[in-house]
Amino acid sequence: MTDIEIYKSWPFRTRFLRPECWALIKDYIVKHEITSVLEFGSGISTILFNNLGVDVVSYETDPVYLRRIKSYNLANVEFRLWDNITASINGVFGLSLVDGAMPRMNQLSYAIKHSRYIAIDDFSDKESSEGLYPMVKDRTRLDDESIKMAIFRRFKQ
């Protein structure tokens, strides 16, 4: 299935990653040869990552929604339920996507520790003022009336 076909066939009435944001993330994945993704907020992006052949660890807060997404039988995805507090994350991922309505600063702290690049959907300046900018560099931000997406590269440690 193409990306457009996936968007057209999306059956859930939930907020999802907009095609313009996906295009930016997909370009980063291809350009930087990213092979693994840590995702906070399962959904259409999970399917799109899977179709790229990227290995995904995807956290979701809603157990009912998680069961529905799991029904897609995505070969490259490991699903986990997020308790809004802690996560058992090992290793370093090429990219983290922070999406959805979870407590984002907690997710961002995990993303910064475990990823080379951090993509934040519906990015706000409030998040940057809460301590994100000092921990990342090479900020690329696409921001207009319809898109609020930011991608950062963390400092090498």
Model segments located where?
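Rossmann-like AdoMet
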Residues: 1-11
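A polyampholytic, Gly/Pro-enriched intrinsically disordered region
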Residues: 77-81, 97, 140
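SAM cofactor-binding core of SAM-dependent methyltransferases
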Residues: 19-84
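Short catalytic-loop micro-motif centered on adjacent basic/acidic residues
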Residues: 36-39, 57-58, 95-99, 119-120
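Short amphipathic alpha-helix with an adjacent loop that forms part of the alpha/beta core around
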Residues: 85-93
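Conserved SAM-binding loop and adjacent beta-strand
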Residues: 10-21
